[in-house]
Amino acid sequence: LPALPEPVPDQAPSSSPAHGRLSLLVLYTDRLEECRAFYSALGLSFAKEKHGDGPEHHAAVLADGTVVELYPVLSAPTGPVRLGLEVDGRRATPPLPPGRHVVTDPDGRKVEVRAHGAQAADTPAGNGGA
């Protein structure tokens, strides 16, 4: 890859939408319900959707407005994808302690999860854990 130019001090990158941000991620799977359960266990809240003649699928809106959709594979599968999520570890099932975790979804995709929130030991008894 070519080297990127160094930012000019008064034009430093910002997190403003004018500089772009991910707004949609679609994962195609032949294990739709398994993937929905997997990502739901990480704290994503999915709604079932159908647009026109398209297939039923699941959609979740992340805290920053990014939409994550799970679609059934209807033709040739798409290429691999690297996925990273930031979640409240207390809402995961089982709860995840703060930090970086790498998990595998039902389609074999490696998912990097950065959990924040209370330590797993700080979660109420009966909510899972090691």
Language model segments and positions:
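Vicinal oxygen chelate
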Residues: L1-A18, R21-D30, E49, H58-A59, T66, Y71, V73-A130
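Core segments of cupin and vicinal oxygen chelate
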Residues: S16-G20, V26-V68
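General helical structural elements
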Residues: C35, E86, V113-R114
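A short, polar/proline- and glycine-enriched secondary-structure boundary/capping micro-motif
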Residues: F46-A47, G79-R82, D122-P124
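Short, charged/polar low-complexity linear motifs in solvent-exposed/disordered segments
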Residues: G54, E86, G128-A130
